[in-house]
Curated annotation (Swiss-Prot):
PANTHER family: PHAGE INTEGRASE-RELATED (PTHR30349), PROPHAGE INTEGRASE INTD-RELATED (PTHR30349:SF64). This is Putative tyrosine recombinase XerC. It holds the Pfam family Phage_integrase. The active site is at residues 156, 183, 256, 259, 283, 292. Keywords: Cell cycle, Cell division, Chromosome partition, Cytoplasm, DNA integration, DNA recombination, DNA-binding. One of its GO terms (biological process) is chromosome segregation. Belongs to the 'phage' integrase family. The keyword Iron does not apply.
Length: 473
């Protein structure tokens, strides 16, 4: 097949697809911008790097959003050409050429501006009726009806221009927007509110008197005034009227800004639902509707003021630090086991709580008495099999008692078993006496350990060695 240029590919794509006139204009505009930069060249001759150079040039004169429109439409043309073998390319040269546009809030029209524009149009209507002369915007009654239709419905400009006489049902108070005229290709209905009803009645009655048929364009200024000679009303005539409103109010006004405005106002009202706005504007998904929502700064300011009036209450008291417990869950009984016998202790009942306290007092004497009992308790084997080869320094009797007190006071239960403290008791007694108790393995010699010091063998098999400045080896 003969190599084709991009304009030829674009024309081929338009012929093989059912596109709206406005969509065709966008494809041709993007192709024209391409030709202005590259000239008359084959579509297969431009590479991805060439497209990036073109993007850099275009972004110097147009917005990022406009460039993305060019990129997406021409990328579609290249994809179509590659799929049908119209161009010999393996990779779409416009792939990954989209840029991230700056996110700006939707442009809306203030209520005071709308009131001024409406009052001016009403004044022009009265002026034409009283003088019989053409006003600056003529016929004023027709343009007031167009103004109110955009204000109350938020209809798209193309959808309004494509409305037929038969699409307006005054009996059911509904406007039917045909799918072939909509951006989303979906047909939907728009209810006629009370404020718009008188204006549509005037338009429909006048159209009936003029002799409109069911398929005629209902909003057609050319048939309501002899001053215009065109067959159909187009977007240029509507935009010309809004330019005059812009000059009068000093604020830019367009049909699409009315669409932004109605979406924002509906979503500021709590009784409105986002799905109502979505259906009214005929959006394909809820995310598109959310983009039209403007933040309510007055409500934000009110909430911020309320927060400032409610000062935080600061508690300057020290909060106790409660360590986290990894024990049983709250409410579950914790089993109590004897450290000597290993049997589970029975919890005390409520009836015997007082008796239990008395028994605890009798069976658990004060700490001082417990230390006296330790001094007479029998010794147990501290070292079971391994000989002692550590060095420690003697401590005084008071220090030994203080260390024992700290160990006893940390006991979590009142039934702290004295049998577990026999090791500590022996350590206290021997340190207080200035002696060290060791157990000697069978293969060791006591002389090696004591180094000539007098040692006494106790009945339980331990050797008592006096403290000295020397080290125990």
């Amino acid at each position: 097949m003969k190599p084709m240029t991009l304009p030829e590919l674009t024309q081929e794509y338009i012929l093989t697809h059912d596109l709206r006139p406005d969509t065709v204009k966008i494809y041709r505009a993007a192709t024209k911008a391409y030709v202005n930069f590259f000239g008359e060249c084959l579509a297969c001759e431009t590479t991805h790097r060439d497209m990036l150079e073109w993007r850099r040039s275009e972004l110097a004169r147009i917005s990022k959003r406009s460039w993305n429109t060019y990129s997406s439409h021409l990328r579609t043309v290249y994809r179509y050409a590659m799929e049908h073998g119209l161009v010999e390319l393996k990779v779409n040269p416009l792939k990954d050429t989209r840029v991230m546009p700056t996110k700006r809030p939707k442009k809306t029209i203030g209520n005071d501006v709308i009131v001024r524009a409406r009052n001016w149009l009403r004044f022009l209507v009265q002026e034409e009726l009283s003088t019989g002369k053409r006003s600056e915007i003529t016929p004023a009654w027709f343009w007031l009806a167009v103004f109110e239709t955009f204000y109350y419905t938020g209809i798209r400009l193309n959808a309004l221009l494509c409305l037929r006489y038969e699409n307006v049902d005054l009996g059911q108070r509904l406007i039917r927007v045909r799918g072939e005229t909509e951006k989303t290709h979906r047909e939907f209905m728009i209810p006629i509110p009370d404020g718009l009803m008188p204006h549509l009645v005037l338009v429909m009655d006048t159209a009936k008197k003029v002799g409109f048929s069911g398929t005629d364009q209902v909003f057609n200024i050319n048939r309501f005034s002899g001053h215009y000679k065109r067959e159909y009303m187009n977007s240029d005539q509507v935009e010309a009227m809004y330019k005059k409103l812009t000059n009068m109010t000093g604020t830019r006004m367009t049909p699409h800004r009315f669409r932004h405005t109605i979406a924002s106002e509906l979503m500021r009202q709590p009784e409105r639902n986002i799905h109502i706005t979505k259906n009214l504007l005929n959006h394909s998904n809820i995310a598109t509707t959310m983009e039209y929502i403007e933040p309510d700064y007055d409500l934000m300011r009110e909430v911020m003021n309320e927060r400032g009036q409610q000062q935080a209450k600061i508690n300057y008291l020290v909060r106790p630090i409660i360590p986290k417990s990894s024990g049983p869950a709250a409410g579950s009984a914790v089993p109590r086991v004897s450290l000597v016998s290993g049997t589970e202790l029975q919890p005390a009942t409520t009836e015997s709580s007082e008796a239990k306290k008395a028994d605890d007092t009798a069976s658990n004497p004060p700490v001082a008495e417990r230390l006296e009992l330790m001094s007479t308790a029998p010794l147990v084997n501290v070292l079971k099999s391994t000989p002692v080869s550590v060095h420690s320094e003697p401590v005084t009797s008071n220090e030994a008692k203080a260390q024992a007190l700290s160990l006893i006071s940390d006991a979590p239960e009142t039934e702290y078993e004295f049998g577990e403290l026999e090791d500590i008791a022996r350590w206290i007694r021997e340190n207080a006496a200035g002696e060290m108790v060791v157990q000697i393995a069978a293969e060791e010699d006591i002389g090696t350990i004591s180094e000539g010091k007098a040692s006494i063998q106790s009945p339980d098999g331990y050797y008592r060695i006096p403290w000295s400045s020397g080290s125990v080896k």
